[in-house]
From Swiss-Prot:
The gene is Foxq1. Expressed in kidney and stomach. Expression in the outer medulla of the kidney and the transitional epithelium. Expressed in the hair follicle medulla. GO terms for molecular function: DNA-binding transcription repressor activity, RNA polymerase II-specific; RNA polymerase II cis-regulatory region sequence-specific DNA binding. It comes from the Eukaryota. Residues 228-239 have a biased composition (Pro residues). Residues 115-210 bind DNA. Pfam families: Forkhead. Plays a role in hair follicle differentiation. It comes from Mus musculus (Mouse). Residues 55-66, 95-104 have a biased composition (Gly residues). This is Forkhead box protein Q1. Keywords: DNA-binding, Nucleus, Transcription, Transcription regulation. Its main location: nucleus. GO terms for biological process: hair follicle morphogenesis; negative regulation of transcription by RNA polymerase II. It is linked to Defects in Foxq1 are the cause of the satin (sa) phenotype and results in a silky coat with high sheen arising from structurally abnormal medulla cells and defects in differentiation of the hair shaft.
Length: 400
């Protein structure tokens, strides 16, 4: 008779019971193995199919004892297997949750609507101009933009900071305090600066003042020759010179001639030099002669200098040629005749007899300008002696 069958079973860690079971016959079934391995399965199946943590722990303990009795692993492997099963279950849980969260995020993709083709300055100005009182708060400006443009209705809210920054950093917007005692309040009004109308000129909203172009200055200076008002009836209009001359056909040259003072007003500027018509030497001589009219009265007597002739109250006179004018009659009142054929070096005005002129270069038909000349001692002696021989050197050397 085998007594080990009726011995009460000890705990899992009892080594004596396990030895007795190993020493006895293995044909006798254990009372704890009635359910068998078919109902419990492996450790992983036990952890997955257990209805509760407590019941699962009890089953695991029973399974560990059964394995010990059937010659399986020792009782110390039971807690390790339980920990492994719990680790697998906890690892499987986050993975399943992550997969579900990813599917939920993919179901709501972020779609950003196209941004309106205006700057924030333009958008804010449009909102303020469309208002009834010409001023809006920051919240009202945001509501206006959200109602008019779909871009501002999405989940993106960074544009609100852009609106606030543009309001405070640009001079074209002025803050109007709702309560002067609370300047730090956030419910103040914003309106357009009346001194910054250039920013919103022509319906275009600019950040900086528009530069004055050359065409605007030309149109503001006056009408062009083609746009001149018509004359009275029956008066034929002369053809403009710009059509006949090939140089004036270019629009750039016309603009430069029409407004020479827009770039540089000096007479030495390139535009002012090019704007003057070309004149030949003959034309310039005739114009110079016209600009030098002679007076009817003679020149007043000049003050005598010690270096001049001692007897000459007005000193000696040197003719300076000026083309295109008639001979002045400076000595007509004193009865002295002047030869107009050549430049003369006249004697003192007080002498009754005319002095013999000194011959110079032939300038027939030329007029002369008379000015006092400081003569050297040789010429003073020659003039005092009266008529004398011709000088061997030209008069031009005296002017040098």
């Amino acid at each position: 008779m085998k007594l080990e069958v009726f011995v009460p079973r000890a705990a899992h860690g009892d080594k004596m019971g396990s030895d007795l079971e190993g020493a006895g016959s293995s044909d006798v079934p254990s009372p704890l193995s009635a359910a068998g391995d078919d109902s419990l399965g492996s450790d992983g199946d036990c952890a997955a199919n257990s209805p509760a943590a407590g019941s699962g722990a009890g089953d695991l303990e029973g399974g560990g004892g059964e394995r010990n009795s059937s010659g399986g692993p020792s009782a110390q492997d039971g807690p390790e297997a339980t920990d492994d099963s719990r680790t697998q279950a906890s690892a499987a849980g986050p993975c399943a949750g992550g997969v579900g969260g990813g599917e939920g995020a993919r179901s709501k993709p972020y779609t950003r609507r196209p941004k309106p083709p205006y700057s924030y300055i333009a958008l804010i100005a449009m909102a303020i101009r469309d208002s009834a009182g010409g001023r809006l708060t920051l919240a009202e400006i945001n509501e206006y933009l959200m109602g008019k443009f779909p871009f501002f209705r999405g989940s993106y809210t960074g544009w609100r900071n852009s609106v606030r920054h543009n309001l405070s950093l640009n001079d074209c917007f002025v803050k109007v305090l709702r309560d002067p005692s609370r300047p730090w309040g956030k419910d103040n009004y914003w309106m357009l600066n009346p001194n910054s109308e250039y920013t919103f000129a022509d319906g275009v909203f600019r950040r900086r003042r528009k530069r004055l172009s050359h065409r605007t200055t030309v149109s503001a200076s006056g009408l062009r020759p083609e746009e001149a008002p018509p004359g009275p009836a029956g008066t034929p209009q002369p053809a403009p010179a710009a059509r006949s001359s090939p140089i004036a056909r270019s629009p750039a040259r016309q603009e430069e001639r029409s407004s020479p003072a827009s770039k540089f007003s000096s007479s030495f500027a390139i535009d002012s030099i090019l704007s003057k018509p070309f004149r030949s030497r003959r034309d310039g001589d005739s114009a110079l002669g016209v600009q030098l009219p002679w007076g009817a009265a003679p020149c007043p007597p000049l003050r005598a200098y010690p270096a001049l002739l001692p007897a000459a109250p007005g000193g000696a006179l040197l003719p300076l040629c000026a083309y295109g004018a008639s001979e002045p009659t400076l000595l007509a009142s004193r009865g002295t005749e002047v030869q107009p054929a050549a430049p003369l070096l006249l004697a003192p005005l007080s002498t009754a007899a005319p002095a013999k002129p000194f011959r110079g270069p032939e300038t027939a038909g030329a007029a002369h300008l008379y000015c006092p000349l400081r003569l050297p001692t040789a010429l003073q002696a020659a003039a005092a002696c009266g008529p004398g021989p011709h000088l061997s050197y030209p008069v031009e050397t005296l002017l040098a």
